[in-house]
Amino acid sequence: RAIKKITNTKTRINYSGRTDAGVHALSQVFDFDTEIQREEENWIKGINANLPKTIAVRKVFNVPDDFDSRFSAVERRYSYVIYNSKNKPLFFDTFSYWVTNNLEINIIKNQLNMFLGHHDFSSFRSSSCNSKNPNKNISYVDVKTIDSFIIITIAANAFLQNMVRIMVGTIIDIAKNE
């Protein structure tokens, strides 16, 4: 609706992908066709003025006509933030998953590395996932700790519905040493 408001035309928007419920997107890419010419700054101001406070456009640029946000993307990156503390998170509760058990970082790293490469991830998707191909290629994994936060980053050609959430949940169960 934000683009329709500033272009006064019905505009089809292509997104690079969906996010699962409760997931926050950084650098989500989308594209649309328009004949309207504006400076980048004016596009950004106009779109942002018509978006909710929780969404912001940071960059705008022209792309070739055959560009498609979803199918031109070669990689998607997902960071999962765990707050690992006995104390309740005060400011980051909507941006992290709270785990009170002490998690073994080396176990997390070892388990995460097992996902690298091309695999069938059927066991790591939602029962409502409609993807015809459960085979995905994970090209990068990383684990960082900052104070009580554990940040797990995974890059792949694509993800299945709830794939990272289920993978990380499984790794957390293993890392609890229960």
Residue ranges and their predicted role:
Residues 2-178:
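Structured-RNA-binding interfaces characteristic of tRNA pseudouridine synthases
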